[in-house]
Amino acid sequence: MRKLSSYIGRYWYGYVFAVASMVTAIALDMLYPKITQKIVDDVILGGQMEILTKLLTGIVLVGIGRSIFGYCKEFTFDFLSSKIGAEMRKDLFNHIQTLSMRYFDDTNTGELMARVKDDVDKIQNALGYVGMLLIEVTIHVVFVLYCMFSLNWKMAFLPVTVMLCCAVVAIIMERKLDKVYEDISEENAVLTTVAEENLAGVRTVKAFAREDYEIKKFLSHNERYYNLNITQSKVLVRYYPLFQFVGKVLPVAITILGGISVMNGNMSLGALVAYVEYSRNCTWPMEMMGWLTNDLSSAVASYKKIKKIYEVKPEIEDSRNVVTLDHVSGNVEFDHVSFKLDGKQILSDISFSVKEGKTLGIMGATGSGKSSIINMLHRFYDTTEGSVRLDGVDIRKISLRQLRRSVAVVLQDVFLFSDTIEENIKMGNRSTMQMDEIKSAAASAQASSFIEKMDEQYETVIGERGVGLSGGQKQRISIARALSKHSPILVMDDSTSALDMETEHEIQKTLNSLKDTTKIIIAHRISAVCHADEIIYLPVSYTHLTLPTT
């Protein structure tokens, strides 16, 4: 993972400009009490009315300059934090895309959504408005204390002592909030997961009349999320009033001490007025400490969560000595392949080969590992023992990009994106595919008949996961997507189960016409594989039998 410093370092010049604008704005702020001191001592008490116009003009000019540099400061911090947030989100999403399937087997989608969106937002906020205030508070305090020591060094020890006490309280508060925010971040991910699963499966929920159960499940997590936020609020309200109290009392205490000095002749009235103004400039940083500590603790917890994702390395990667095939013919061989997942034996000593242009049918009982063969061929997982070869080369030596571009797959669990039918079909070859090729693929998959009856035809936007389409329609679009890829290997995982016999027969005719394409067809129905050159059967004993075909 790139450190935060590397993101900030990219835009160091922007931060230098922002901090320089901030320093200038704060320096101008420090002039107000000085001008006020002059007005009291020289104009009101000294009767020098001739300088009043200059002093008032100075106040106006200082105000204009303060506004200009304040705008530059805030705009630059907001702009830079937005840029860094976008880059962090992009890098995190890119890293997630590189992770192996095993990681997604063990991680909820809602958790990843929370990390990419909510946690990056909190870090972005810390690098923007919150970070700006933290730097501003620090510089402001330094400038104010310098001015206060210049006016009366003895009285300056009072605000210094108070600020040190507030800093200690802020550290204690941060430590208490740190664990709470980690729990809040975890529960936010769980809550997002529950909501995402429920909304994605709303038809199943309604079909089984499980609305009440799902509501109770959501409310239980919502209540825990609420309780954690209340715990955070209790910590905040326990300490935050202290900062506010000190902020209100400090100017009063300085006024009393300064008044005594004025009466004793040790300080002018104008100097006292200026000193009180400076003390008020001390109070807002102290009042901000509680709020800043709260937001920074939240950002730190989010950073830790994101860091954990970056600590996960992909299990499936390109080998150091990648082999690039000049041409992929489509010869597939499984050589004594065994596969275990989480200690469970899925495949055991599986061997078969499919020559270029031939068709292999795979049948078997539920749970016998038929779909795991697809996982092996795509290198979603690596074999525990044995090897899978493509054109005689172990697929572990072939680049993942070339391997997966060489295999088109129609998965059992059809997933269509919330986009147009056109975009869903040309997903595998998006950059070069023309409309006539899209229509040809749809016709080959027997999908053009229902697509062209729609009002928008190929521009029809389908819902998430193909909501609004029948199971057979979704399967046909998925088949069209695979055919449009024109890969040398085509794998179909029980992908005609929702089709009627006539449509299935037409698709089989299309598959038979693909003479140069190696086809692996996984099915439960014998009708789906009856035209295969060879059929293997996978019983639950993890090995296979070869069935004769005619």
Predicted regions and their residues:
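Transmembrane helices of ABC transporter permease
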Residues: 10, 14-27, 57-58, 62-65, ...
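Membrane-integrated ABC transporters
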Residues: 1-29, 36, 44-56, 65, ...
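Hydrophobic alpha-helical transmembrane bundles that constitute the permease/transmembrane domains
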Residues: 23-34, 63-71, 123-126, 130-142, ...
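Short intracellular "coupling" helices and adjacent cytoplasmic loop segments at the cytosolic face
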Residues: 45-46, 82, 90-114, 118-120, ...
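A short, hydrophobic C-terminal helix/tail in secreted or cell-surface proteins
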Residues: 546-550
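Helix-loop-helix
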Residues: 48-50, 54, 147-161, 231-304, ...
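An intracellular "coupling" helix at the cytosolic face of ABC transporter transmembrane type-1 domains
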Residues: 101-102, 118-127, 131, 135, ...
